[in-house]
């Protein structure tokens, strides 16, 4: 059985973009693959985090993973900082990565642009991400387009390590879903929907109530033409809404174009709002159940225990290959 690894930062907000692009497919993948789903809290502290808020967000994210349908009997759900091997492996990989490779990362350029000072952690984020993936002999990493460059660097580091120290790592592949992988902002459909957008109208969260969802979709940017057809270049706003509708309803974009032929944006948006509300309602109910349940800690304890067994063994092999410590 092939292995999948995926990590999400505990930022406190999960958008429907995250749900469609990642979480939703995780639920299907867990039955076909050996899956590790990681709450990457060490990645989160590359920028300042309020400690109390971070700890709350870790718990909330775990509850959201379970609420969308991750089954702890089928997949391993754990917190990155509870598995020390991640930081240990990241240091070893930092020692074989080049500064130039890290500085070329698009995300580093974007996040450091215009800032007087940036943390070293922001620059060395990719080796930690590579460690996350390589520790579990990962075959497949489901990611959005924006993470492709990091996976390419992970592959380079795995190949470099294998060449220098002997075959140890599986070379992972990125899996980018074709439909709905890149859900765009509701206020600027040329940009990806992001939880860090300063305008809350730009995204819908997993926990938004019905009224908020209706308002956000009603105010979503479209165009003045008024016809419901998919054209990413000329009609990015309505194309983005069609993408959301198609992915959540299971109807093809062609079916939706026929269904709404001759109908206005108002009718389409009202129907889409109901599709989103009905999709999120059971998730929200399960989320509140998990947040109030002591079972959540048991799931995370078991996940950390399982991940530690696998990851610590890989770190031992890495250290042995690099000549660290004593041979036992």
Swiss-Prot record:
Output the PROSITE patterns linked to this UniProt entry.
AA_TRNA_LIGASE_I
Q: Which InterPro entries match?
A: aa-tRNA-synth_I_CS, aa-tRNA-synth_Ic, Rossmann-like_a/b/a_fold, Trp-tRNA-ligase, Trp-tRNA-ligase_bac-type, Trp-tRNA_synthetase
GO BP terms: namely: tryptophanyl-tRNA aminoacylation
- Residues given in the record as L-tryptophan binding sites: 132
Q: Which residues bind ATP?
A: 9-11, 17-18, 144-146, 183, 192-196
Alphabetized SUPFAM superfamilies for the sequence: Nucleotidylyl transferase
What is known about its subunit structure? Homodimer.
HAMAP family reported for this sequence: Trp_tRNA_synth_B (MF_00140_B)
Name of the molecule in the record: Tryptophan--tRNA ligase
**Which organism encodes this protein?**
Geobacillus stearothermophilus (Bacillus stearothermophilus)
